[in-house]
């Protein structure tokens, strides 16, 4: 039988989770080029069109976590994420704000929504993420969301770069990032508390770290 390792304390476990930042999307060469102002309009359009597929699947991913979770106190904490992305009315929510960005980079909403520009690798990665949330234990789904730990700083840098290097882009269309930075700061505190509180054995802690590593791989794609 394999060696059984003792559970990490909360500080050690949080450190393991945070160590996965080394694989976060802001290190990807494409995003480094974006932040350096080296992308052309076509490259930005391709990115926005493909990122849409991830955006529109986030509510389904979160709904899967809620459906799998037997704890009402956790479900209540997670449900607002669905409304955040879907909005509470047409034209509201994170997905709607992403379509405003699509308008600004020169895409029509029709070509974004019908996903004609979607790359097979992006579809595979995002579908794998939704399947993960549907088929893995709910706490692993929550752990996979902890890329939010790294999102505020990376999104802030992205927003500065877009405003600085892409003057042709309507800066009012960057509202998705402005709202998401604050929201991610709140959500990561909540998700981290859930994971630290419910992953109290070493196997569950290791599974949470693997879930977060999987999510960084999804975003890298």
Residue ranges and their predicted role:
Residues 2-221:
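Non-heme di-metal
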């Amino acid at each position: 039988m394999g060696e059984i390792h003792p559970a990490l304390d909360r500080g050690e476990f949080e450190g393991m989770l945070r160590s996965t930042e080394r694989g976060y999307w802001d290190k990807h060469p494409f995003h480094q080029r974006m932040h350096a102002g080296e992308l052309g309009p076509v490259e930005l359009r391709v990115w926005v069109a493909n990122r849409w597929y991830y955006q529109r699947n986030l509510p389904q991913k979160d709904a899967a976590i809620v459906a799998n979770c037997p704890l009402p106190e956790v479900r209540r904490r997670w449900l607002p994420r669905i409304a955040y992305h879907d909005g509470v009315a047409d034209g509201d929510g994170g997905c709607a704000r992403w379509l405003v960005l699509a308008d600004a980079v020169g895409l029509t909403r029709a070509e974004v929504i019908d996903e004609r520009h979607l790359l097979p690798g992006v579809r595979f990665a995002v579908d794998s993420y939704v399947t993960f949330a549907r088929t893995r234990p709910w706490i692993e789904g929550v752990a996979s969301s902890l890329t939010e730990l790294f999102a505020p700083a990376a999104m802030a840098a992205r927003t500065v770069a877009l405003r600085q290097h892409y003057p042709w882009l309507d800066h009012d269309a960057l509202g998705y990032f402005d709202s998401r930075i604050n929201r991610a700061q709140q959500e990561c505190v909540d998700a981290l508390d859930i994971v630290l509180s419910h992953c109290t054995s070493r196997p569950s802690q290791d599974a949470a770290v693997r879930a977060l590593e999987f999510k960084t791989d999804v975003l890298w794609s």
